[in-house]
Amino acid sequence: VKNQNPFGTCWAFGMAAIMETSLLAQNKGTYDLSEEHLSYFFSNRQNDPLGNTPDDKNYVLGNYHETGGNDHLAAIYLSTWAGMTTEADVPFPTDSSHQNDLTVQIPESKAYNSAAYLKNASVSKYSEERMKEMLLNDHAVSIMLYMKESYVNPDTAAYCYPVGKSNSTVINHIVTVVGWDDTYSKDNFLPVSNVTSDGAWIIKNSWGEKKGDGGYYYLSYQDPNINKLVSAEAVAVSDQKYRNNYFYDGSSALSVIPIQAGQSVAAVYETTAGKGKAEVLGEVNLVTNSDNACYKIQIYTDLTDPYDPESGTAAYAAPYEFEQPIAGVQTISVPEVVLKQGSRYSVVITNSGIDKISFGVEAKSSYGNWFTCTAGIETGQTFYKSASETARWTDGKTKNWTARIKAHTRTLNQSWVPDTPVFQVKAYNSGYNLISWEKVSGVTGYYVYRKPAAGGKWSKIADVGTSELKYKDSKVTANASYRYTVKAYYEASGKRYSGKYKTGDVIKAAPAVQKVTSVKSEKNGIRIRWKPQKKCDGYYIYRKKKGGSYQLIKKISNGNSSSYLDKKAQKGVSYYYA
């Protein structure tokens, strides 16, 4: 049990408590998370590590230690992974007697220091059934209520704000529910509380161990002010597989938009976290205010139009489906997708249910006189589309909101490697070799290499764009033997990354066009002469009559031959030879 004295940061203590309890329930040990880090950076928000949210701000009006907050806002904030760090890293600014000590300035560089991340957060209105469900799921629930010590029974540590005292809910505090007792007697509460039935929640307060029963209290199920239930699933940073968090929604407003059945929202990102290395997307994070929300999720890679989230290649043969039973912040594990550095990808989320979803968005918002948000919304970030088959994507900027869609990736140890092209080479006696290959998806172009068959180094002879799948190598020596290969490459952030290659078979360039140097009649026939070519294996002799077609009349297997006597030529007939 911690002590928030002398500050009004009960909300940060509530969030820390449910995160710590989640880690403890996972057998991760006892964590002491920093409430000061959360409350300070919530109201002094910094740009995220990927640089996508420079103008997203939360403004707490007045002293952030005294203004207050709530854990629904805190959960949205922590979905950006701005904490939580440890108490040792950013300690609570009081001395041993709980007198404030604000002389130590927290460095901005610690904004994203974290020992644990928020994975999921469930948010709900109050009911006994829902409270128990959330406790069974996450082991602790932060709640809002009105806490006044005069309504505490000092003998039993039982508390209940007087039932029927007010027609409206009043709130001044946040505590953490850690259990329940259906048999806890109504007689343990003060008569002024007007409790009429048994049953109590076991709550952990943040007023120190000297208050209540070692810092714990019994709270009647009937307390009229119990409100805003928030539970959390935390993950230790050391256990987080995907360490890159892509998002545009840095501020923490509770704004939502209606997404009807069949309608979609999407976010488009450029892959930059890997700094030249490929990344793998494995999680999607979103926010909704609706229970039992049903989604279909599709990832599109290599977008050709940054303003069309579906202009790339669909990663899944069929969209990945997911149901979120309780409203809140949800991280969804999806089948992994490899992303090339510098490429654009999208996360498209479609309402696959029959009911409307209240989907979380970032927007400029104000909450009374204590809290405001600004949203640095840019074009090309997030989009929405109606359910019509002919519908087109509309930029969220036109409505002044950004959808709360985050993508979690991990960085590979190497750049993305394109597939090896399947290719073939043919020699043509017009003086060139033709290299052709099959298309490789997701690439920018192809390199063609050549080297002598007898050995030597590869030489790049062509850089071919994706519009062509062949190259004519005219700089060959007749009858010379070569090897070829083709590499696919992609371009990202001004750099090119090529794939592996397979060495082709030896191919011999076709001989040069053979010219006949003379044709003369001799006693026994007609003599055809030519100048022999180097490295030639032989010659084909063709003949035709005037107006006819060439016919093969002889195959000569000696490459050094320079003449042939056509003994079958008829006297008085004109012939043409090649």
Q: What kind of feature is each model-predicted range?
A:
Residues 467-472, 560-564:
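Short S/T/G- and acidic-enriched coil/turn segments that sit immediately N-terminal to beta-strands
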Residues 349-414, 500-504:
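Short, surface-exposed beta-strand/loop patches at domain edges
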Residues 201, 295-297, 446-448, 539-541, ...:
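Short beta-strand elements bearing conserved aromatic residues within extracellular beta-rich modules
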